[in-house]
Amino acid sequence: MAISKEKKNEIIAQYARHEGDTGSVEVQVAVLTWEINHLNDHIKQHKKDHATYRGLMKKIGHRRNLLAYLRRTDVNRYRELIQSLGLRR
């Protein structure tokens, strides 16, 4: 199931850098993280769903690239985002 419009707007409101911000790295990573967590739960129940697993791997790679970009450009924003999302335990 895809992310609902309400849930996506809630995530955007929480991580937006300014009003109307939907494309900043923080927002993109937060939305991807929600989708990755949701797909992880699906994969745990449906172990043979290889198409979804491939989509999950693509999303993880996209998030990894965005986080690498953010770390290169602004380390403080990167650390705050990692902390708030609970990544890199």
UniProtKB/Swiss-Prot annotation:
GO terms for biological process: translation. Keywords: Ribonucleoprotein, Ribosomal protein, RNA-binding, rRNA-binding. PROSITE patterns: RIBOSOMAL_S15 (PS00362). Gene3D superfamilies: 6.10.250.3130, S15/NS1, RNA-binding. Pfam families: Ribosomal_S15. GO terms for cellular component: cytosolic small ribosomal subunit. It comes from the Bacteria. HAMAP family: Ribosomal_uS15_B. Belongs to the universal ribosomal protein uS15 family. Part of the 30S ribosomal subunit. Forms a bridge to the 50S subunit in the 70S ribosome, contacting the 23S rRNA. One of the primary rRNA binding proteins, it binds directly to 16S rRNA where it helps nucleate assembly of the platform of the 30S subunit by binding and bridging several RNA helices of the 16S rRNA. Forms an intersubunit bridge (bridge B4) with the 23S rRNA of the 50S subunit in the ribosome. This is Small ribosomal subunit protein uS15.
